[in-house]
Amino acid sequence: VRATEKFASMYFFCHSPQSAETDVAERGNKRPVWIMGHMVNAIAQIDEFVNLGANSIETDVSFDSSANPEYTYHGVPCDCGRTCTKWEHFNEFLKGLRKATTPGDSKYHEKLVLVVFDLKTGRLYDNQASDAGKKLAKSLLQNYWNNGNNGGRAYIVLSIPNLAHYKLIAGFKEALTSEGHPELMDKVGYDFSGNDDIGDVANAYKKAGVTGHVWQSDGITNCLLRGLDRVGKAVANRDSSNGYINKVYYWTVDKRQSTRDALDAGVDGIMTNYPDVIADVLNESAYKAKFRIASYDDNPWETYKN
């Protein structure tokens, strides 16, 4: 019996309806934030990053010359202060990730609710993008979603570095549909990660037929500094009545002051090598009043309206 069920009856004795309403109102007035553990490429790192405070992870996916997803691997160079060479076979990583996100499993982490796959498609020809999407979908269906039978529950973001590879999205959707599981697209979102002009990104989504589930990244390696100008443009698009963006995240943020700056700019997610740093800042009184760590009940495809 889960603790929440066990103590449900006690809750009604302890809480008046009014205080329950206050809890909901307080939750509704705080922006849900995703603390995104960066470069989680070995199964053992899933526990490590979630235990430090991450409710989301980012994993690199490399492809072979036939557009098969091959390894969870970044390689050199990578962020300052990190080992760049941890890896797993992609399908094995998916199995480990499934355990970490399947309720009832001994490795289950309730707080791990979102996974960003950083798709390293740079070595693929543009005309292989659709194939890469199909093969990626089949790998996820079999090894993560367990062919639709009580698989992992995390939401998935497909992060694509090249706007020219927009057909990856259609290929992914086509494969899930042909395999009989179009409903799993409800758990899938998108990101173009190349720091392109916001208007160009919008056009790529138009070509891809995407009208929702959009995360927009902005950032640079922690070895270099980058301002928040483009983040501001992405946030403005997100908050406009006709924008295409649902969520904005910034990477890679490892320091308290840059965390505060990103939160002040209105981001929904912060990618970091040090989840505990972000969690500490979110506990500061100024930020605790406005933000909270996202849970599974927070739909990552919905634009937050305060």
UniProtKB/Swiss-Prot annotation:
Propeptide: 2-27
Reaction(s) the record says it catalyses: an N-(acyl)-sphingosylphosphocholine = an N-(acyl)-sphingosyl-1,3-cyclic phosphate + choline; an N-(acyl)-sphingosylphosphoethanolamine = an N-(acyl)-sphingosyl-1,3-cyclic phosphate + ethanolamine; a 1-acyl-sn-glycero-3-phosphocholine = a 1-acyl-sn-glycero-2,3-cyclic phosphate + choline; a 1-acyl-sn-glycero-3-phosphoethanolamine = a 1-acyl-sn-glycero-2,3-cyclic phosphate + ethanolamine
GO BP annotations listed: killing of cells of another organism; lipid catabolic process
Gene Ontology CC, one term: extracellular region
Signal peptide positions on this chain: 1
Positions bearing carbohydrate: N283
Binding site for Mg(2+): E58, D60, D118
EC number of this enzyme: 4.6.1.-
Highest rank taxon of the organism: Eukaryota
Record note on cofactor: Binds 1 Mg(2+) ion per subunit.
Main location: secreted
GO molecular function terms listed in the Swiss-Prot or TrEMBL record: lyase activity; metal ion binding; phosphoric diester hydrolase activity; toxin activity
Gene3D superfamilies given in the database record: Phosphatidylinositol (PI) phosphodiesterase (3.20.20.190)
Cofactor: Mg(2+)
SUPFAM superfamilies in the cross-refs: PLC-like phosphodiesterases
Subcellular location: Secreted
Enzyme class per UniProt: lyase
Disulfide bonds: C78-C84, C80-C223
Keywords for the protein's UniProt record, in alphabetical order: Cytolysis, Dermonecrotic toxin, Disulfide bond, Glycoprotein, Hemolysis, Lipid degradation, Lipid metabolism, Lyase, Magnesium, Metal-binding, Secreted, Signal, Toxin, Zymogen
Entries under Pfam families matching the protein: GDPD_2
Tissue expr: Expressed by the venom gland.
Function: Dermonecrotic toxins cleave the phosphodiester linkage between the phosphate and headgroup of certain phospholipids (sphingolipid and lysolipid substrates), forming an alcohol (often choline) and a cyclic phosphate. This toxin acts on sphingomyelin (SM). It may also act on ceramide phosphoethanolamine (CPE), lysophosphatidylcholine (LPC) and lysophosphatidylethanolamine (LPE), but not on lysophosphatidylserine (LPS), and lysophosphatidylglycerol (LPG). It acts by transphosphatidylation, releasing exclusively cyclic phosphate products as second products.
Similarity annotation: Belongs to the arthropod phospholipase D family. Class II subfamily.
Entry protein name: Dermonecrotic toxin LarSicTox-alphaIB1ai
